[in-house]
């Protein structure tokens, strides 16, 4: 009986020792990889900011209010037409499904 408990205790301590040693090493790797990740992230955000400002400047140079108004008008007319025809289609479909009642 005593040998079994001693064997179990040794195995538990061995597993705990491996866990402690295993947990210690990845933290160092994690610290270096997180700093690398942070550097990459900062670099990406820097490039993103430059690209965003360039595109925004280009958009402001080429912005045409008359074209914008025409696009909005076409969108409003087309959505009104689509909603009208969708209503007609729905009514026809319901009348076909119900039949002559």
Curated annotation (Swiss-Prot):
It is found in: Secreted. Proapolipoprotein C-II is synthesized as a sialic acid containing glycoprotein which is subsequently desialylated prior to its proteolytic processing. It comes from Neomonachus schauinslandi (Hawaiian monk seal). Belongs to the apolipoprotein C2 family. Component of chylomicrons, very low-density lipoproteins (VLDL), low-density lipoproteins (LDL), and high-density lipoproteins (HDL) in plasma. Plays an important role in lipoprotein metabolism as an activator of lipoprotein lipase. Both proapolipoprotein C-II and apolipoprotein C-II can activate lipoprotein lipase. GO terms for biological process: lipid catabolic process; lipid transport; positive regulation of phospholipid catabolic process. Residues 78-101 are annotated as: Lipoprotein lipase cofactor. GO terms for molecular function: phospholipase activator activity; phospholipase binding. Keywords: Chylomicron, Glycoprotein, HDL, LDL, Lipid degradation, Lipid metabolism, Lipid transport, Secreted, Sialic acid, Signal, Transport, VLDL. Residues 66-74 are annotated as: Lipid binding. This is Apolipoprotein C-II. It comes from the Eukaryota. Residues 1-22 form the signal peptide. Gene3D superfamilies: Apolipoprotein C-II. The gene is APOC2.
């Amino acid at each position: 009986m005593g040998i079994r408990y001693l064997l179990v205790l040794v195995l538990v301590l061995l597993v705990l020792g491996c866990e402690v040693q295993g947990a210690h090493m990845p933290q160092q790797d994690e610290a270096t990889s997180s700093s690398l990740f942070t550097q990459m992230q900062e670099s990406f955000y820097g490039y993103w900011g430059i690209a965003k400002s360039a595109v925004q400047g280009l958009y402001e140079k080429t912005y045409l209010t008359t074209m914008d108004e025409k696009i909005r008008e076409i969108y409003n007319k087309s959505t009104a037409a689509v909603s009208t025809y969708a209503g007609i289609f729905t009514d026809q479909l319901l009348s076909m499904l119900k039949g002559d009642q």
